[in-house]
A protein has these predicted regions:
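Extracellular glycan-modifying ectodomains
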Residues: 1-418
Length: 418
């Protein structure tokens, strides 16, 4: 057999040594560099080093947690994400880390279907709450995400999970329990070419929130035509979390707007951030426009409890149980309510039943986006009476025979149990 030239063998040895040195250097740097608690680029808390215990070692949970920790704390994580996304895009891959690179530059987060148990628990917590407060009008607006409304902009052959069977099942179960489901899918679909979702973020734009508000106002008995708005651009450099999560469109910047009433006679509201013991006379914290998380301009981000009071002739009080999608919509509702109490169950740890009495709540509105609504567990815990114990949830049936299609499915639900 003919021997390889010495130069070739030398090149192979050198390459192997350099690669080994590189791996060793990265391991050492990962060990020496302090952990980061928060990723400004991804706008999320990063996983900290997990504690070791015998039970976690036996169950394998420690290994899973440690893998997540290493992934979050890896040296130059943001750079590696962008590099991988660039390489994947060159190879023709249009999906990275659960985010699709769609047409017209849209990044769309895939929908993770909830387990049947998760769906049952969330919906039954809401129907049980409705039964305990059957004297109050209750509404639910579960906003569809871009992957639903802008499905025509998904890349070819994208296997996106259909949200519609789950929204239909939720609507049927809630309506049966007396909770009015505010379905904004048709409204948003009619305006899908009007910039209702950000290109680089998972939120709807203020324009999208406004269209949803117009539909919600009809259900709430609000004359939305009584106030006209002007759209005011407040930033031209917004870059959302989907860009950071996927690495796609890393240099993309887009416009962020607010809607301001044209009529100066519209009463001003006072916003009370209860946990922070801070009051302001604006829905917007413009200092956030100088940060990575520009969407936090709306109500300074997410808080456990925020109380909005408005000197209006209306004597209505509204409890909004919400996620961040509500933040850009609530300013449209404020002029029509004497008091709006916003509760984000992810950060709220008090007794919701007591809050209902103290704040003299007259109406209840759930305002979520579908991705958060079907994955978060905090809503169930917040709605549960503090003295209650776990029970077997009733079944909320979904017709998901084709979860990648755009067709809706019929749904039904059993009677809720306490």
């Amino acid at each position: 057999m003919k021997k390889k030239p010495n130069g070739y063998r030398y090149f192979c040895h050198l390459t192997g040594c350099l690669f080994g040195i590189f791996i060793l250097a990265v391991l050492i740097i990962n060990f020496l560099v302090p952990d980061r608690g928060f990723s400004q680029k991804e706008n999320r808390v990063l996983t900290s080093r997990p504690a070791i215990s015998v039970s976690q070692l036996k169950s394998g949970k420690f290994a899973d947690d440690y893998e997540t920790y290493v992934n979050d704390q890896f040296f130059l994580r943001d750079w590696w994400i962008t590099l991988r996304a660039t390489a994947q895009r060159i190879l023709g891959n249009t999906e990275e880390n659960g985010v699709f690179l769609g047409k017209n530059g849209y990044l769309m987060e895939d929908f993770t279907a909830p387990s049947q148990e998760r769906l049952n628990r969330t919906v039954n917590a809401m129907t049980d709450f409705a039964a305990r407060h059957s004297d109050l009008p209750q509404y639910a607006l579960i906003a569809p995400n871009a992957v639903n409304i802008l499905s025509d902009k998904l890349p070819a052959l994208a296997a996106a999970t259909d949200q519609n069977p789950y929204l239909d099942a939720t609507a049927a179960a809630l309506e049966k329990a007396g909770v009015t489901f505010v379905d904004v899918r048709d409204t948003l679909s009619q305006h899908k070419d009007d910039g209702i979702y950000y290109h680089t973020d998972h939120h709807w734009t203020t324009q999208g929130a406004y269209f949803a508000y117009m539909q919600l106002a009809k259900v709430l008995g609000i004359d939305s035509s009584s106030i006209s708005y002007d759209k005011l651009p407040v930033s031209m450099s917004f870059q959302g979390t989907l860009s950071a999560k996927s690495g796609f469109r890393a240099s993309e910047k887009e416009e962020m707007d607010v809607f301001l009433p044209r009529d100066d006679s519209v009463p001003s509201s006072v916003v009370n951030y209860v946990d922070e013991q801070k009051k302001t006379a604006s829905f917007y914290d413009t200092s956030k426009l100088e940060t990575r998380d520009k969407y936090a301009m709306f109500f300074n981000g997410n808080h456990g409890k925020v109380v909005i009071t408005t000197p209006t002739e209306e004597n209505r009080t509204l409890l909004v149980i919400k996620d961040s999608y509500a933040n850009s919509l609530i300013p449209f509702l404020a002029p029509y309510y004497r008091k709006i109490v916003m509760v984000d169950p992810r950060y709220f740890y008090d007794d919701l039943e007591e809050l209902m009495q103290v704040e003299e709540i007259q109406e209840v509105l759930y305002l979520y986006n579908a991705n958060t609504f079907y994955s978060d567990t905090s809503l169930e815990l917040a709605l549960m009476p503090q003295s209650s114990t776990d029970s077997t949830p009733d079944s909320v049936e979904t017709d998901n025979t084709d979860t990648t299609s755009a067709s809706s499915a019929n749904a039904s639900a059993d009677n809720p149990e306490a």
